[in-house]
């Protein structure tokens, strides 16, 4: 028999099944804070390419990979592309007071210097696409204006809700279908850079239709990365209208509640969140719930009760992961924020019995994933164990939300990192030096015993496709007792 499986890396046993995504920023850019966040439960590091230089991001990637090696546990890198985000230009002095009832002129930033007193906006087609009476929302909807007249290139607005408008704040035009590309020139340049840094997932902002994801995947394929998993961020009304086609072609979905709540009104977001998560669960693709999960912890060391309930409800809805944005990027308590997400997840998952998701295809793999549910309900299992080259077997096992963690043995470093985003999965990166499938099981048992993850008498449910060295769907299910 060949030497025991040599695990290059493995993830430490989970105390929480719901994965934690943390945005990296000034508050979390030191080695010590990253270590503490990983210890606290961070699984995925989000790199927000709306901010920061390439030098900043390259430094963070090196830091994250070094901590990953040092702590011998995966840190998945998620590159979040800015997408066609419309923003206010630079304002004199950096800000402008908007008063209710005041008239404000919006002009393209390129000609702002020819219109003293006007506010520049980096969308040149506003005057030709806007309509009188349309709402224009600024700074995540905190400020609101209404279009009262159009004198190309100026759009004259009346301030409905005033306040301080700062440079580079976001602009939302909820009533308009805009002629924007799905990927901007900046996105393409940023993604080229991300690929050179070895990112594990990429998310595209302001997706409107399935074709947007096809465009991104074609871009990746042309650059030799056809298998890099892609997340579609759902934050536009058009995305809700085209949700089924977007979910069908994406590898994952993010419920981006910030812009979504501005575009469709906040009272609709809870229902939409549940529907988006349900669609993802049916398709067996991972879903992240994001934005303002613990927003008050940017300033405070404890969340509000409503925030704790919000996180718990996302988990009960069936989300794979919950995400921190400003809390971990610029907040005063990045480590405590991760700890709090973990604690809420642990408490919510106690006795959690999610509705099992029906198979979507009549295949051996889907049939076996259904059988997994029955066996899990009868036997006292320690783990579900999957052997996978593509990650699909592990995804299906996780999607059934079993009562025990799913261990995913894979020889692919890409799959190892991508599965680290998925609910309940503990990924192991192994080599392929084995003769028979029985050898593989035996060696996997030794590996788990060495890490004190199993003991004599524990039962494992093993899912795999055999022969293991031939790519194919899952066709094998075995109950294995630790000897």
From Swiss-Prot:
<dbReference type="GO" id="GO:0005829">
    <property type="term" value="C:cytosol"/>
</dbReference>
<comment type="subunit">
    <text>Homotetramer.</text>
</comment>
<dbReference type="InterPro" id="IPR015795">
    <property type="entry name" value="Pyrv_Knase_C"/>
</dbReference>
<feature type="binding site">
    <location>
        <position position="258"/>
    </location>
    <ligand>
        <name>substrate</name>
    </ligand>
</feature>
<comment type="pathway">
    <text>Carbohydrate degradation; glycolysis; pyruvate from D-glyceraldehyde 3-phosphate: step 5/5.</text>
</comment>
<dbReference type="GO" id="GO:0005737">
    <property type="term" value="C:cytoplasm"/>
</dbReference>
<keyword id="KW-0630">Potassium</keyword>
<feature type="binding site">
    <location>
        <position position="87"/>
    </location>
    <ligand>
        <name>ATP</name>
    </ligand>
</feature>
<dbReference type="InterPro" id="IPR018209">
    <property type="entry name" value="Pyrv_Knase_AS"/>
</dbReference>
<protein>
    <recommendedName>
        <fullName>Pyruvate kinase 1</fullName>
        <ecNumber>2.7.1.40</ecNumber>
    </recommendedName>
</protein>
<keyword id="KW-0670">Pyruvate</keyword>
<dbReference type="InterPro" id="IPR015793">
    <property type="entry name" value="Pyrv_Knase_brl"/>
</dbReference>
<feature type="binding site">
    <location>
        <position position="50"/>
    </location>
    <ligand>
        <name>K(+)</name>
    </ligand>
</feature>
<dbReference type="InterPro" id="IPR015806">
    <property type="entry name" value="Pyrv_Knase_insert_dom_sf"/>
</dbReference>
<dbReference type="GO" id="GO:0006096">
    <property type="term" value="P:glycolytic process"/>
</dbReference>
<feature type="binding site">
    <location>
        <begin position="48"/>
        <end position="51"/>
    </location>
    <ligand>
        <name>ATP</name>
    </ligand>
</feature>
<feature type="binding site">
    <location>
        <position position="235"/>
    </location>
    <ligand>
        <name>Mg(2+)</name>
    </ligand>
</feature>
<keyword id="KW-0547">Nucleotide-binding</keyword>
<dbReference type="GO" id="GO:0000287">
    <property type="term" value="F:magnesium ion binding"/>
</dbReference>
<keyword id="KW-0808">Transferase</keyword>
<feature type="binding site">
    <location>
        <position position="259"/>
    </location>
    <ligand>
        <name>Mg(2+)</name>
    </ligand>
</feature>
<dbReference type="InterPro" id="IPR001697">
    <property type="entry name" value="Pyr_Knase"/>
</dbReference>
<dbReference type="Pfam" id="PF00224">
    <property type="entry name" value="PK"/>
</dbReference>
<dbReference type="InterPro" id="IPR040442">
    <property type="entry name" value="Pyrv_kinase-like_dom_sf"/>
</dbReference>
<feature type="site" description="Transition state stabilizer">
    <location>
        <position position="233"/>
    </location>
</feature>
<keyword id="KW-0067">ATP-binding</keyword>
<dbReference type="GO" id="GO:0016301">
    <property type="term" value="F:kinase activity"/>
</dbReference>
<dbReference type="GO" id="GO:0030955">
    <property type="term" value="F:potassium ion binding"/>
</dbReference>
<comment type="similarity">
    <text>Belongs to the pyruvate kinase family.</text>
</comment>
<dbReference type="Pfam" id="PF02887">
    <property type="entry name" value="PK_C"/>
</dbReference>
<dbReference type="InterPro" id="IPR011037">
    <property type="entry name" value="Pyrv_Knase-like_insert_dom_sf"/>
</dbReference>
<feature type="binding site">
    <location>
        <position position="169"/>
    </location>
    <ligand>
        <name>ATP</name>
    </ligand>
</feature>
<dbReference type="InterPro" id="IPR015813">
    <property type="entry name" value="Pyrv/PenolPyrv_kinase-like_dom"/>
</dbReference>
<feature type="binding site">
    <location>
        <position position="291"/>
    </location>
    <ligand>
        <name>substrate</name>
    </ligand>
</feature>
<keyword id="KW-0479">Metal-binding</keyword>
<keyword id="KW-0418">Kinase</keyword>
<feature type="binding site">
    <location>
        <position position="46"/>
    </location>
    <ligand>
        <name>substrate</name>
    </ligand>
</feature>
<feature type="binding site">
    <location>
        <position position="259"/>
    </location>
    <ligand>
        <name>substrate</name>
    </ligand>
</feature>
<dbReference type="GO" id="GO:0005524">
    <property type="term" value="F:ATP binding"/>
</dbReference>
<feature type="binding site">
    <location>
        <position position="80"/>
    </location>
    <ligand>
        <name>K(+)</name>
    </ligand>
</feature>
<keyword id="KW-0460">Magnesium</keyword>
<feature type="binding site">
    <location>
        <position position="48"/>
    </location>
    <ligand>
        <name>K(+)</name>
    </ligand>
</feature>
């Amino acid at each position: 028999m060949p030497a025991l499986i040599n695990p290059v890396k493995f993830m430490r046993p989970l105390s929480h099944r719901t994965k934690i995504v943390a945005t990296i920023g000034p508050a979390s850019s030191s080695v010590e804070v990253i270590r503490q966040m990983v210890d606290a439960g961070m699984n995925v590091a989000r790199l927000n390419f709306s901010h920061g230089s390439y030098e900043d991001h390259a430094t963070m990637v090196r830091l994250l990979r070094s901590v990953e090696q040092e702590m011998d546990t995966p840190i998945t890198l998620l590159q979040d592309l800015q997408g066609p985000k419309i923003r206010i230009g630079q304002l004199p002095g950096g800000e402008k007071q908007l008063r209710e009832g005041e008239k404000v002129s919006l002009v393209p930033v390129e000609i702002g210097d020819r219109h003293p007193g006007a506010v520049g906006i980096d969308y040149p087609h506003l005057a030709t696409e806007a309509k009188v009476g349309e709402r224009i929302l600024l700074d995540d909807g905190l400020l609101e204006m209404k279009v009262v007249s159009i004198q190309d290139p100026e759009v004259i607005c009346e301030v409905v809700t005033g306040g301080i408008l700062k440079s580079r704040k976001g602009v939302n035009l909820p009533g308009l279908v805009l002629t924007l590309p799905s990927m901007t020139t900046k996105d393409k340049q940023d993604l080229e850079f991300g690929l050179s840094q070895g990112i594990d997932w990429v998310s595209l902002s302001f997706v409107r239709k399935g074709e947007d994801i096809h465009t991104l995947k074609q871009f990746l394929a042309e650059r030799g990365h056809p298998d890099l998993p892609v997340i579609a961020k759902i934050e536009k009304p058009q995305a809700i209208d085209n949700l089924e086609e977007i979910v069908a072609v994406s590898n994952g979905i993010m419920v981006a509640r910030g812009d979504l709540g501005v575009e469709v009104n906040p009272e609709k977001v809870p229902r939409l969140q549940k529907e988006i998560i349900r669609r993802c669960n049916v398709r067996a693709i991972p879903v992240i719930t994001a934005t303002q999960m613990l927003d008050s912890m940017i300033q405070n060391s404890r969340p509000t009760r409503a925030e704790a309930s919000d996180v718990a409800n996302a988990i009960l809805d069936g989300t794979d992961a919950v995400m921190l944005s400003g809390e971990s990027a610029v907040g005063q308590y990045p480590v405590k924020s991760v700890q709090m997400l973990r604690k809420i997840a642990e408490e919510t998952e106690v006795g959690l019995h999610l509705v099992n998701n029906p198979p979507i295809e009549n295949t051996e793999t889907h049939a076996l994933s259904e059988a997994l549910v029955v066996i899990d309900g009868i036997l006292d299992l320690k783990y579900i164990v999957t052997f996978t080259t593509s990650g699909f077997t592990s995804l299906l096992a996780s999607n059934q939300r079993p009562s025990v963690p799913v261990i995913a043995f894979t020889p692919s470093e890409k799959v190892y990192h991508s599965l680290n985003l998925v609910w309940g999965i503990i990924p192991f990166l192994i080599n392929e030096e084995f003769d028979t499938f029985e050898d593989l099981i035996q060696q996997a048992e030794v590996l788990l015993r060495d890490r004190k993850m199993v003991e004599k008498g524990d039962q494992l449910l093993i899912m795999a496709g055999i022969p293991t060295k031939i790519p194919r769907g899952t066709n094998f299910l075995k109950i294995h007792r630790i000897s």
